[in-house]
Amino acid sequence: MFRRICKPFILLASTLLLGSVASANPAAPSDSTIALLQKAVTGDWRSAAHKARDQYRHPIETLQFFGLKPDMTVIELQPGGGWYTEILAPVLYAHGHLLEASNPKFADRIKANPAVFGHIGEIIPFDPPKQVRLGAENSADMVLSFRNAHDWLMDSPETLAAVFKSVFDVLKPGGVFGFEEHRAKPFATATESAMALHRIPEDYLIAVALKTGFRVAGVSEINANPKDPEDINVHRLPPDLSGPAAEHAQMQAIGESDRMTLMFVKP
């Protein structure tokens, strides 16, 4: 399931310019962890629309790749509609701790569905670039970001760097930053890709992670989509289909965006 960073020459260039990129298999999840993930993904609290996206988002495989365990302290960054939250919250309920770094409006979603979201331990005020601190240093086992980084880069490269630094600070040594993002073409101009397409080149994000102090512990193709040409705005693809109706069938045939799935570790 591990992959080249983009193509072999990109891996070589990244290694020469940025330092060694480790590609290590994460520890295999236990049977109990797999059972909890399967129960959460098939839970009746998840809507049919959310479940329909599993074919593109691969939640069980993605969280296994990151090494999620039910006794971890996990911070999810900017959960949006809570697609991953409704999976994470039940898995971490009994023995772990889930914190959501979001704006205060996410509290309304928790109140609306306490049976699922009531297990969340805390909402951390998080509004880059104004608020990026995630908590006490060395306090979290894992931080997760699902398709958020282009928003930080759209604000500025400094905002993206500040978020990475905040994640690094809050993680314990050995802690994991599980990262998924819409992928731009290799060596595309990062800021322009973020602004126009809501995508970022993979080599750019790896460079930011290494500069922050992370090592790259794993790179996976779990969420890759070779049908995606990587040169169109991701919102034209499912599920948004924001373009004209005449192109919807074409976009549906492509599926959701091609996405990088990276595992960064704090030494």
Language-model regions: role of each:
Residues T33-P70:
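Class I SAM-dependent methyltransferase Rossmann-like catalytic core
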Residues P70-G80:
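Conserved class I S-adenosyl-L-methionine
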Residues G81-Y93:
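Conserved SAM-binding loop of SAM-dependent methyltransferases across substrates and taxa
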Residues A89-P90, E158-P173:
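A short glycine-rich, Lys/Arg-flanked "PGG" loop and its adjoining helix->strand segment in the class I
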Residues V132-L144:
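A short acidic, Gly/Pro-enriched loop at the edge of an enzyme's catalytic core
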Residues G174-E181:
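Conserved beta-strand signature within the Rossmann-like core of class I S-adenosyl-L-methionine
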Residues A190-A217:
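Conserved Class I S-adenosyl-L-methionine
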Residues M251-P267:
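C-terminal lobe and adjacent flexible extensions of AdoMet/dcAdoMet transferase-like proteins
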